[in-house]
Each structure stands twice: as structure tokens, then as C-alpha cells.
Amino acid sequence: MRSALSAFNEVWQRQFRADCLSQIQALPEQSRFLIGCSGGMDSMLLLHLMSFLCPEKIRVIYIDHQLQACSHAWGEFVRAQCAALNLPFIIQKVQVAQGNLENQARSARYQAFAQHLQADEILVLAHHQQDQAETLMLRLLSGAGVHGLAAMKKFDVREDFTLWRPLLDLSREQICQWAAQLHVQNIQDLTNFDTDYDRAWSREILWPLLSDRFPKMQQALSRTSYLMQDADEILYEVLQQDLAACGSSQMLSLAALQQLSQARQRQLLSHWMKGEGQYRPSFEMVQRLFSEVIGSREDSQAALHWNGFYYLRFQQQLHRIAKAEYLPTEPIQEVAVVTCVAGQCHKLPAGHFVIQPSEVGLSPELLGQQLQIRPRLGGEKIHLYGRVGSWPLKKAIQQAQIFPWQRHTIQILSRDNVMLGVFTPQGFWLAQSEFCTQAGWQPTLSLNAKSAISDLQS
């Protein structure tokens, strides 16, 4: 390791070093670090400081957004700097989707980070105090609540990875001073000064005006973000209690929800819609959920789409349904032929079904025979085993309270036009027929099908 003492001369620099080492030592011993480096001053300083503190534990990644002609050259600059420091280096090109350029570039960048992060590896980024203050101010102007105003956390544990921002308490002036002291080379991205972008406009035009009037604004806004993080943590604890009382991540009881105050209802719905995502819905989107779905008639089947999920009311429940489940892309084959074998697992639209022995079920003579499976056509009747008489299959489905968005997955198993049973999302319904017998077999719905799957739709 190079001598680090000369890099940490001033009191605040020594304090930074002590804080970083303390945070590193608090992590599991096997923890390693992937540094996101753009080649700019902030990330190049971070690169040098981390190379002083734990060179044997770091890798470096440069994301080439391919938005500027010189982006490849910047990547080669970072590669050369890493080679001089003997640090492993990755360059990853990404395609930025159409839309808001800042948001889409950020999304592509984080997807690339997640792709390269290894087990026990923490992503390290160079956001600093002014970045934090700018983020809070921009979110305030966009109408964010407590969660949004909490801005960036120093340690951010996400679903897929953990993110560490060691420079978050350093001012822009401190970073410039330290980079000059260490003779850190860096590139200059001119888009950082392009006021067509909100953040650059804020930094170049709005920030100087406010700073002249409020010299301590940067520190004050940074402090506010920490206070908002405290408030957000307390709010999260309350929301977890409310969620447990009202339902789950996929369903809320409207009766239980309506026992809460309006403020807690609104916060719970916002938290619930966010799910495992990073961002909450807008205030207007939550209000639409109230007016268009919760306030709709029970039989209206109103649905609200946001961020890949559909939000629907079914009777006195509110459901969060993935788009793939609500709007299936693969049509169900009209008629398929299936051969059932004991222990075999079959993949159907209604779920995975395993052929298992049953005290009462279908005759073993049907095993290995060709059976037919088809979707509902409408008007079918079923004589459920153990019940008296036949009744409309539609009524049986309604009585079982199978969700409307799942009913298209229901299929009928038959032999020579004799109904043997019905595959439903709740399980297999055995039909009374000449093929029913003691010591038979039935398809059993499996919640964790690990057996070999026979796709009946192929």
C-alpha cells in the first residue's frame, strides 16, 4: 500500500479517513468495493482515496453512455489511471432509452452497475454535499414528500445491492482543495454546464443566487436531508405496522384501510404502490387510486396502471397485480392432449400441478392415457365430487371467489367429452364421473414445483 499519511494532512481529512476506516471495519470482513468512476473530479478523488485506504479490495467501473463523441476517450483515461494505481478496471457501454435523458441515463447506469456487482461487493459512488443539497432542492420543487426529501443516504441498502457514498459530507470546496493537493487528474464533461438540464441549471444559475443570500445553504439543506431520513425511518416503522394490519404487499383490506386516518391511508397506499421499487408514486397517482379504484363500484373492475403493476378492487379488497398476470401475452391453446404419469409436474396457466395419489380421485387406468384439456367455453356445468347435483361452472367460480383477472386460466380436463375435473388457481376440482374411484389420483396444485415440468401448452 502506498503511504496514505501525506494524503490526509488536515484535521477534516484525517477525520474523513477515520470515518471511512471505521465504516469499512463495520462491514463483513469479506466485503469488497466496486467504484463507479466517470473520470470527473469527484469520482477521480474518490478513486485515489479508496486506493489509499483499501487497494486490495476495490475494482473500478466506467459506464460509457455513448451520448458524446468523447465518451470512449474518457473511458480510456480512467483505464490509464487505474493501470497506474494497479486497480482492476471495467468499461461497460450502455444504450440510453428515449425519454427524459437524465433519468434514462441514470437507469441504464444503475442497471450496468447491478450487472457487474459480485457477491459481497458494495457499489461506491462520489456524491458529495452539494449533490445532496441539489437533490433535495430539485425534489422539493417537484413536490416530493418525506421519503423524497430524505434524498441520498450514505449507506443505501437496496433490493439488489448496497450503495456507499463516502464523500456525502464533504463540500464541493473541500473536494476541489483535496483534488488539487493530490494532483488528481480528471476530465471535464461540458454537459455539466448545459443549463437545458435541470440539475445543471440549478447548479449554474439558481445555486449562486441562493448562496449569495444564504451562505450556509448547502450545509443547511444537507442537514435537512438527514432530518428527513430520521422522519422517513419513523414513518417506515408506522407503515410496516399499518401494512401488517391491513394486508400484505399484494392485497389490502379496504375495511381495515378505512379505519386509518386520511393521512395514514395516503401514506400507506404510497408505500404499498412503491413496493420493492426505488421511487414512490406521485401525489396525483395516489389520489387517482382513491378516486378511480377505491371509490368505484364493487363490480366495476376499475384498474389503475402504474410502474408495471395494475391496482384493482375486488369486493372489499385492493389488489396489486403484475402486468404479466393481469395482461397475459400468450394465448391459451384451445385444446391440448396430455398424458398423466404419477409424480409428473405439469405447467398450466393456473399453476403447476403434480400428479399424486389420492384417497378419492381419478381411476389409475387413466394414467398413461390421452386426456384432453381445454379452456372454458361458457355454459358448462360441473358435478363436484361430494356434492349433490350439477351446477353452472360460472357460479362455482364466483362462489369460490376466484379473482376475475385469473379466470381466463381455468381449464377443463376431460376424457371422451366426460368432464374429469377443472384446473383452477385454487387447485384441481374433481368432477363426479364414471372415472372416479377410491385409491385414485389427482393433479395437486404445487406452490413450489421443482419436478420436471411438462408444458401442456406446447
Enumerate the predicted regions with their spans.
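AMP-forming adenylation/ATP pyrophosphatase catalytic core
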Residues: 2, 8, 12-39, 59, ...
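Core alpha/beta nucleotide-donor-binding catalytic domains of modification enzymes
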Residues: 2-208
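Proline-centered helix-kink/hinge sites
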Residues: 88, 166, 208, 215, ...
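Residue-level recognition of alpha-helical structural elements
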Residues: 101, 217-220, 300-302
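PAPS/PAP-binding and catalytic site of the sulfotransferase fold
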Residues: 178, 202-210, 264-275
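Internal, active-site/partner-interface "lid" segment
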Residues: 192-200, 218-229
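Conserved anion/nucleotide-ligand pocket segment
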Residues: 205, 209-221
